[in-house]
């Protein structure tokens, strides 16, 4: 690299992959001016530019983790629950980096460095309670290198459920829009709709058409209503769904039926004001995002006949354009599982007996945290892997 001005840079001779510009492994140069990629540099700028020779290497946009848990109260509950986790991985302070610790739940500095080392530049916190938004933003701001955002949980919000029960989509949309603007959220998250509200009374819902206790609104109505709100507001991302019955044998059918709920909606993402010019359209075709699909891909009717339902769910997903997913794959070894689905975590606690934490956010949502070890010797874990 030339020891010269940092205002301009050229990354040369790399194999470039850029789906939005229909570039698939071509050898191209990347020109950067003041931190932004540009189409070209002037002769004077190119002469003074720092040069990185990426010959034989892959060059691609920074990775985007669309679903993670990296900031907020449940993450800190995990850090407090797992002092042993911090001994497993310790990063010493250097001249340009902070110290940090933590393996499955790293400190904010360390998680920023770890993500960057893997090539990620953007990470989203997938469950931000409105009452805990300020602290979530504090931690995201303290995380180095990464661009970050958060999804706000609405699937068990009292006001949302009341408006949907009344059939007033416009009022629900106005409420969601105000909440997102006030709390600086990026998207709408829906976690075990109707079930988390029931968990405040030690109950859950078992199906999409079972009404919850006090609002008498079903999971199906909440998913459909929030998806309609999402498109009415023209958000850049789809409704982010954590399906009902997560982690239970046979739940792939619940996941499939949940995805079918939004299939008749027309996607409406308003990206004109914020999207850079690209060769491929930035308009999304999807109306629902299924989070950590692996945990919603179980077959069988009990743990005795548990099997993978992934082929069946994948077959449906591949036949439709309204769905986008992340796999939610798990590696073997220690984990600190955390979710806005309190009853699912309690079920896991009853199976494993590991350290468990539960929290209820009044009128809004809940969460659960559990330490876990994924084992090669476990038939269930091996099937999940």
What is the meaning of each model-derived region?
Residues 129-172:
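Mid-domain alpha/beta scaffold segments of enzyme catalytic cores
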Residues 54-139:
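Metal-associated gating/positioning segment near the N- to mid-region
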Residues 14, 30, 35, 56, ...:
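Divalent metal-coordination and catalytic microenvironments
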Residues 62-66, 123-125, 148-153, 186-190, ...:
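Hydrophobic faces of well-ordered beta-strands that scaffold small-molecule active sites
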Residues 89-94, 115-117, 157-159, 196-211:
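Gly-rich Lys/Arg/Thr-decorated short loops/hinges at beta-loop-alpha junctions or inter-strand turns
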Residues 104-112, 167-180:
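Short, acidic/polar
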Residues 175-229, 245-258, 262-385:
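Active-site neighborhoods of metal-dependent hydrolases
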Residues 1-48, 53-59:
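N-terminal metal-binding scaffold of metallo-dependent hydrolase/deaminase domains
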